[in-house]
Amino acid sequence: TSIRHRPPDPQAMYAGREVFAELAEPARKRGMKLYVRHYQPSQEATRYLDGFESVLAVDHAGRPHNKPCWNHPDYRGYLLGTMRDMFETYPLDGLQYGAERPTPMTDVIFGGKGFICFCEHCQARGKRSGINVDRAREGGKVLCDLVTALTKGTARTPDGVMAEFLAVLLKYPEVLAWERLWHDSGNEVHKLLYDALKAIRPQVEVGRHVDHRQSSWDLFYRAGSRYQDMPDHVDFIKPIVYHDILGPRLQQNYLEPLQQGLLKELTLPQSLDLFYAWFGHSRDAEPGVELLAEGLSPQYVYNETKRAVEGAAGRAAVYAGIGLDIPSGSGWGTDVWQSDPEEVYAVVEKAFTAGAAGIVASREYEEITTASLQVVGRAVRDVWETR
């Protein structure tokens, strides 16, 4: 691969120390296993990886995307080489790998970005799959133009916005074929990682992180990368089920973009009702638009955990990612959020009731208050005492 890890900054925290090696023995003494979480890098990784810009996806207009291409051989080489080296060098028990990224369709619909990926490697794979690449590119452009015009208020939609959207897909079925190709490519990367690590140590546990977008509000992810298709390349699945922060995230990342685009003919309350209906939540149990900032109920955690458990069908464990004290606001989060202790207890209980084999206290340890951790511990002990 052309990608190279840069030597760490000698002034950085823990520089020159083998952190995984140092953690192994203390973890063993406490009866704990040591897992690594590999986060899908974005364009920002160019600060740490030489050559990373060469593997970024390319949109329909030839512009670089901010995430790497699934099919680029140098990206796959970097990913597999890095993971092999880590598991051959350190006494790691498992990996949680997860790519937090929208699909090509949702990148356009929710993010206003170009339709991806049309690098030489994706084009070659598309041709091998029998897809007309030029038609896929043209359809992607038409879709982008429609969403842009809707956002600007210049679109002409005499038959209605949704009919106009469906007309694009009917005229260019290659767009959906390209979306399918993207999902297949991503699942293939997960399988390559799984096989590579099992070849090193069969007892290594390989898991898939399903981020908040994928688990909770992205219909294209729900249709294209389904839980029932994951157990052939994972030992466990960790769906993100952050109940309280989902309210603000839903408003910012789902309702507002659609209000400017494909669902602009609906009011915000109507769009929210449609979301609840599409994603299997009770309108009576969940908040209206005016209370959405307070988050969703523990029942949401039950619903999404149960969906993952039923999809895995006993072929992979499900560890529900419970959100604790996750800041709200744009980006990574800037506004401090203290989770309600009673709700924390309830969501842990709901996750296990739905069939989860375990939970993951999420998102970041340094964000979580001692009070929240104590409630989680009490809830887990209470659940296991009744089993």
Where are these regions (language model features)?
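Conserved, mostly hydrophobic/aromatic
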Residues: 27, 79, 86, 95, ...
